[in-house]
Amino acid sequence: MAPLDLDKYVEIARLCKYLPENDLKRLCDYVCDLLLEESNVQPVSTPVTVCGDIHGQFYDLCELFRTGGQVPDTNYIFMGDFVDRGYYSLETFTYLLALKAKWPDRITLLRGNHESRQITQVYGFYDECQTKYGNANAWRYCTKVFDMLTVAALIDEQILCVHGGLSPDIKTLDQIRTIERNQEIPHKGAFCDLVWSDPEDVDTWAISPRGAGWLFGAKVTNEFVHINNLKLICRAHQLVHEGYKFMFDEKLVTVWSAPNYCYRCGNIASIMVFKDVNTREPKLFRAVPDSERVIPPRTTTPYFL
């Protein structure tokens, strides 16, 4: 079989186009093989730029790259939730996969709670694949990649990046390293908590209103950071109107990278640039104006009209 034309895939994806089904399958298989080599806690070196949820907002992802620099000039960590809710989940995920395939050491993709079969069948990605390809094969190829995505990244051994937050079942990074990640996200337990939990002003742990994961407080965060010799926990998973938010004596930061979320929230987005572990700079960006994006029709037009 001919080798993958990764340059072509990147170029197609950059134009907000999706690949022919067979090319997408080959790209997904290729990225799965790359992800197989990655640890549950993937080491990453500074300088690096950390990004939060994207949710299928393709044109805003392009704005993110204009703000932070293109791959491979900038080294990126994306903390999950690439798909669902936005108009272009398929094109967004395809673009990130193509970049990962072409420059695997310059972009680290973490799993979010939306990188799941169950969630994508409810929040849009499954239906989008069905509409654009006429079948669910593309969705199946992508969900195989979901299962392979790593769950955390560790910047210079001192900054932990994870989609959601902490778990009462995890005290050390080594306990994250032993999780069996190649599966659908379970309904409860350590793996589930890492992608579903939220920081909150609670004593230790509290039931999460999301119905999965936990709410965790400053005491829990400080203990975890201390035991694991960390400076900071970076996470995404929650809309922040200002783009980012520090909590718990600046031991934790939420980074949100989907501006004007769902095309109506009016929020700013951010990415967090780490020159080194002690030098961080948030970069803010706004949604691309409607004149610069293509708004797809609500439903596909029947062929015979």
Curated annotation (Swiss-Prot):
Gene3D superfamilies, alphabetized: 3.60.21.10
Tissue: Ubiquitously expressed in all tissues tested with highest expression levels in testis, heart, kidney, brain, stomach, liver and skeletal muscle and lowest in placenta, lung colon and spleen.
InterPro entries xref list: Calcineurin-like_PHP_ApaH (IPR004843), Metallo-depent_PP-like (IPR029052), PPA2-like (IPR047129), Ser/Thr-sp_prot-phosphatase (IPR006186)
Record key words, sorted: Acetylation, Cell cycle, Cytoplasm, Hydrolase, Immunity, Innate immunity, Manganese, Metal-binding, Mitochondrion, Protein phosphatase
SUPFAM superfamilies: Metallo-dependent phosphatases (SSF56300)
Active site: H114 (proton donor)
Catalytic reaction(s) noted: O-phospho-L-seryl-[protein] + H2O = L-seryl-[protein] + phosphate; O-phospho-L-threonyl-[protein] + H2O = L-threonyl-[protein] + phosphate
Cofactor binding summary note: Binds 2 manganese ions per subunit.
Residues recorded with modification N-acetylmethionine: M1
Annotated Pfam families: Metallophos
Biological process annotations from GO: COPII vesicle coating; G1/S transition of mitotic cell cycle; innate immune response; negative regulation of cGAS/STING signaling pathway; protein dephosphorylation
Keyword Metal-binding listed: yes
Cofactor(s) the protein needs: Mn(2+)
Residues at which Mn(2+) 2 binds: D81, N113, H163, H237
CDD domains: MPP_PP2A_PP4_PP6
Entry's EC annotation: 3.1.3.16
One MF annotation (Gene Ontology) recorded for this entry: metal ion binding
Induction per the UniProt record: Regulated by IL2/interleukin-2 in peripheral blood T cells.
Function statement: Catalytic subunit of protein phosphatase 6 (PP6). PP6 is a component of a signaling pathway regulating cell cycle progression in response to IL2 receptor stimulation. N-terminal domain restricts G1 to S phase progression in cancer cells, in part through control of cyclin D1. During mitosis, regulates spindle positioning. Down-regulates MAP3K7 kinase activation of the IL1 signaling pathway by dephosphorylation of MAP3K7. Also participates in the innate immune defense against viruses by desphosphorylating RIGI, an essential step that triggers RIGI-mediated signaling activation.
Similarity comment: Belongs to the PPP phosphatase family. PP-6 (PP-V) subfamily.
Quaternary structure note: Protein phosphatase 6 (PP6) holoenzyme is proposed to be a heterotrimeric complex formed by the catalytic subunit, a SAPS domain-containing subunit (PP6R) and an ankyrin repeat-domain containing regulatory subunit (ARS). Interacts with subunits PPP6R1, PPP6R2 and PPP6R3. Interacts with subunit ANKRD28. Interacts with IGBP1. Interacts with MAP3K7. Interacts with NFKBIE. Interacts with TRIM14 and WRNIP1; these interactions positively regulate the RIG-I signaling pathway.
Entry protein name: Serine/threonine-protein phosphatase 6 catalytic subunit
Organism: Homo sapiens (Human)
Taxon lineage: Eukaryota, Metazoa, Chordata, Craniata, Vertebrata
Protein encoded by which gene: PPP6C
